């Protein structure tokens, strides 16, 4: 899957980490904290975006040209 993620500066990344840590210290689960901060970033971000491809989708992206031939099963 290709997606455009907000391009964050080092300082913005640090602020996000600190916000996640703060939410976790207040009792929120890590998954909830990450999701909340990610949503806040997506909602408020006005800068550029970075195109990314997730590893699990690499096979779909590569198409059939790069697959190894399947070996026949022994009977």
Curated annotation (Swiss-Prot):
Q: Kindly give the InterPro entries that the UniProt entry links to this protein.
A: UPF0181
Q: Which residues cross the membrane?
A: none
Highest taxon, organism lineage? Bacteria
NCBIfam families reported in the protein's UniProt record? PRK05114.1 (NF003476)
- Quote the HAMAP family the UniProt record gives: UPF0181 (MF_00507)
Entry similarity comment: Belongs to the UPF0181 family.
What protein does this entry describe? UPF0181 protein ETA_15280
- What organism is the protein native to? Erwinia tasmaniensis (strain DSM 17950 / CFBP 7177 / CIP 109463 / NCPPB 4357 / Et1/99)
